[in-house]
């Protein structure tokens, strides 16, 4: 039986692509383990899946000054030692890393054990963790073809983004029943990321009187961001977040308004949902979401509304443009074949 160790964490985006791949390897009887941090989101997600999970020390890698920068390099070194010992015991045939700060010690620990390491980079430019890790990797899979110019050409394999199978299996009838929506108006699903987005939430709520004339709204507003005064508003449903219901919600969704995190927007792409993308600004991120969104706009998948331009008027304008040009967007979206991503990655894992 072949063995594989997965790693990646710090945010859900560094875990969900692994969840898209793991079931396919389970079908092929791979022995699967996961190495992550002691308290990261990856621990909660992976343990729910019943996959053996091993914790290591980890320190955050920062591009800015912080007093924790003094302590964290020592935590990374401790993490490398922890990972080295764990990998030596597990004896995997290959390691698959999705990035995030916890992945660096695992990648180095794997390299020291002479285990082939495969990376996956979701964004147009590599994050700091993958920038460090790629020198220890034999291959790096990229979601965007444009990402290749930022990486060693001999290691790069373009795959697109692996999408979880359950996202593609939503039931329209269940979605309508869950939300209490009618079939008569189009549905817009609005997502601000796992923590929500204050400006998006406020603007959407200000725009509701106009939007609800033509659309039904599902608003995933993030933890602590519900507006109690809108709980019973007809045609509007708000949630902090959803889990098992998301595929059914997406099944009835006509348009999406979202941040531009790579994993989420590739799920919308695979489901052929036209998008208004509101990327995180350069002041709040390293600018990767802006590049992601602009790439989707160039390919005709989405319309980009920059954070600094978000107003009630601009939001409604972008939604109307999406609605009026729906067929044009659908034609572009149909050209993408999301199923090839997992097949390509599985093939290279098997050959490692």
Swiss-Prot record:
SUPFAM superfamilies in the cross-refs: UDP-Glycosyltransferase/glycogen phosphorylase
Catalytic reaction annotation: di-trans,octa-cis-undecaprenyl diphospho-N-acetyl-alpha-D-muramoyl-L-alanyl-D-glutamyl-meso-2,6-diaminopimeloyl-D-alanyl-D-alanine + UDP-N-acetyl-alpha-D-glucosamine = di-trans,octa-cis-undecaprenyl diphospho-[N-acetyl-alpha-D-glucosaminyl-(1->4)]-N-acetyl-alpha-D-muramoyl-L-alanyl-D-glutamyl-meso-2,6-diaminopimeloyl-D-alanyl-D-alanine + UDP + H(+)
CDD domains named among the record's database cross-references: GT28_MurG
EC top class, as a word: transferase
MF terms (GO), sorted A to Z: UDP-N-acetyl-D-glucosamine:N-acetylmuramoyl-L-alanyl-D-glutamyl-meso-2,6-diaminopimelyl-D-alanyl-D-alanine-diphosphoundecaprenol 4-beta-N-acetylglucosaminlytransferase activity; undecaprenyldiphospho-muramoylpentapeptide beta-N-acetylglucosaminyltransferase activity
GO cellular component: plasma membrane
Gene Ontology process terms (BP): carbohydrate metabolic process; cell division; cell wall organization; lipid glycosylation; peptidoglycan biosynthetic process; regulation of cell shape
Keyword annotations: Cell cycle, Cell division, Cell membrane, Cell shape, Cell wall biogenesis/degradation, Glycosyltransferase, Membrane, Peptidoglycan synthesis, Transferase
Signal peptide positions (record): none
Membrane-topology descriptor: Peripheral membrane protein
Pathway the protein contributes to: Cell wall biogenesis; peptidoglycan biosynthesis
InterPro entries: GlcNAc_MurG, Glyco_trans_28_C, GlycoTrans_28_N
Compartments where found: Cell membrane
Binding-site list for UDP-N-acetyl-alpha-D-glucosamine: 11-13, 164, 194, 289
Claim: Glycosyltransferase is one of the keywords in the record: yes
Any single Pfam family the record assigns to this protein: Glyco_tran_28_C
Job description of the protein: Cell wall formation. Catalyzes the transfer of a GlcNAc subunit on undecaprenyl-pyrophosphoryl-MurNAc-pentapeptide (lipid intermediate I) to form undecaprenyl-pyrophosphoryl-MurNAc-(pentapeptide)GlcNAc (lipid intermediate II).
Record family assignment: Belongs to the glycosyltransferase 28 family. MurG subfamily.
Entries under HAMAP family matching the protein: MurG
Protein name according to UniProt: UDP-N-acetylglucosamine--N-acetylmuramyl-(pentapeptide) pyrophosphoryl-undecaprenol N-acetylglucosamine transferase 2
Source species of the chain: Bacillus cereus (strain ATCC 10987 / NRS 248)
Gene of this entry: murG2
């Amino acid at each position: 039986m072949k063995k594989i160790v997965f790693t990646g964490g710090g945010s859900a985006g560094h875990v969900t692509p692994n969840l898209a791949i793991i079931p396919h390897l389970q079908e092929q009887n791979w022995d699967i383990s996961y190495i992550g941090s002691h308290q990261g989101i990856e621990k909660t997600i992976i343990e729910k899946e019943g996959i053996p999970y091993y914790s290591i020390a980890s320190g955050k890698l920062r591009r800015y000054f912080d007093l924790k920068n003094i302590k964290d390099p020592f935590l990374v070194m401790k993490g490398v030692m922890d990972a080295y010992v764990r990998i030596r015991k597990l004896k995997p045939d290959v390691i698959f890393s999705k990035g995030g700060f916890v992945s660096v010690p695992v990648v180095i620990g794997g390299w020291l054990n002479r285990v082939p390491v495969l990376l996956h980079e979701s964004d147009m430019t590599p994050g700091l963790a993958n920038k460090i890790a790629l020198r220890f990797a034999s291959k790096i899979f990229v979601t965007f073809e444009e990402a290749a110019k930022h990486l060693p050409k001999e290691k790069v394999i373009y795959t697109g983004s692996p999408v979880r199978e359950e996202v593609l299996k939503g039931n329209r009838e269940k979605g309508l029943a869950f939300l209490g929506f009618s079939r008569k108006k189009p549905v817009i699903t609005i997502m601000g990321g796992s923590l929500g987005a204050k400006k998006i939430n406020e603007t959407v709520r200000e725009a509701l009187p106009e939007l609800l004339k033509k659309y039904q709204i599902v608003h995933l507003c993030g933890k602590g961001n519900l507006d109690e005064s809108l709980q019973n508003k007809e045609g509007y449903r708000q949630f902090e977040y959803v889990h098992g219901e998301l595929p059914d919600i997406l099944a009835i969704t006509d348009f999406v308004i979202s941040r531009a995190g790579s994993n989420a927007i590739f799920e919308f792409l695979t489901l052929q949902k036209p998008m208004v993308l509101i990327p995180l600004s350069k002041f709040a991120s390293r600018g990767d979401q802006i590049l992601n969104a602009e790439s989707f706009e160039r390919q005709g998948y989405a319309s980009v509304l920059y954070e600094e331009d978000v107003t009630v008027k601009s939001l409604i304008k972008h939604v109307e443009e999406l609605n009026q040009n729906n067929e044009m967007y659908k034609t572009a979206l149909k050209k993408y074949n999301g199923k090839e991503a997992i097949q390509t990655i599985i093939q290279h894992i098997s050959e490692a």
